[in-house]
Amino acid sequence: MIKCVNCGAESAGKYCPGCGQEVAPKRMTVRLVFKDSTHKLLHLENPSINTIRQLIMWPGRTAKNYITGARKSLIKPYKFFLSWQTFHVLIFHWLSKNYFSYTNSVNQNNPDDKKELILMQQLIDQNIKYFDYLIPLFFAFFFYLFYRKKTGINFAESLSVSFYWISITLIISIIFMFLSLMYVKLWAVPIVFNIIFLTFASMRFSGSMKLSGAIKGLTAVILSYAVYLTLAVTLILAYVNNFHK
């Protein structure tokens, strides 16, 4: 019998029956430190990686599993969204100057218009953390509006679904932000992939994989982005026109 160095319980096995720690832990080495620090991060059973994998491969089924109670292997929707939204904001602040510089260089407007454009870009950069929260709310609303009768979903459940799926669109956007370092025009490409993903996810969730299902899903997605962009642009223009004349 070996006495556990952590809780003092005795065990004949490899792990302590009281606290679960190794009864005879190995001495620390550089290799062991690296293995311990990367195992949970890179292992497929890591909750974050597992949630991403499931949402990409089975977006409808995964979201439906969560709202029906099968949640053990998944990160909570808001926590998942908050993590990727924070990462998205950091990467946006870091890389947006490259894209804004490009758009300014090809813009042929007069100096006053160019000055206004630069101000709008600064406002977007400063407030992207707030704008990121608008699209999940609008998508949740339209998803609930379009699918509540067919699926029986309520708004809280729709919001959970939205946080999951919008998180995947943020991941797609982050990937293209990095790719834009090689070809700057790729910065604007994610919107296409995001619309396709959200439409497909909506179809899978509702079980409607026919043309009518695609049209319904696409309509909900387009309306979400349209309202989001309209509100965002209106707020920015109102600020520019009223405070920076």
Predicted segments — roles?
Residues 1-245:
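Membrane-proximal intrinsically disordered regions of secretory-pathway and membrane-system proteins
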